[in-house]
Amino acid sequence: MTDQQVRIVSLGDIAPNRRRGGDLRALLTPTTAGSTSGFMGVAIVQPGDRIAEHYHPYSEEFVYVTEGALEVDLDGVPHSLGTGQGLLIPQDMRHRFRNAGDVEARLVFHLGPLAPRPELGHVDTEDAEGNALPCDGAHAGHAAGHERPAPAAEVVS
């Protein structure tokens, strides 16, 4: 038997994070649910809205579209992702999401493994309006000699 407490978290329990665009809600995290290997959340993206380009130096990101459709740029290469489709975004791959449709899009995301500290897990490369941010090589995993690998991704219907 385990001593771990079961925690049910509702979308409405989590405040929206709009700093990167869209409405991002990290539902199941070390803080909210006691997770130790990753975290899961939901992104709600209105028509014409976007989630700014970023990458994760320690984690892969698994995404699954539950409603609507999104354009996702993977290291600058655009791909379409629709309802019922999933995508694995490799560690270190730059990515951004756009809702080019006319209905709300919802995306479930999971990242794992966790970064050594939360502030190291996410590197923004542009702001919510799409303006490039300076890239600090000492930021995130780069301080430990971490290098970005060559791009690779696959979208499967």
UniProtKB/Swiss-Prot annotation:
Gene3D superfamilies: Jelly Rolls. SUPFAM superfamilies: RmlC-like cupins (SSF51182). Residues 116-157 are annotated as: Disordered. It comes from the Bacteria. Residues 42-108 form the Cupin type-2 domain. Belongs to the SchB/CurC family. This is 16.7 kDa protein in whiE locus. It comes from Streptomyces coelicolor (strain ATCC BAA-471 / A3(2) / M145).
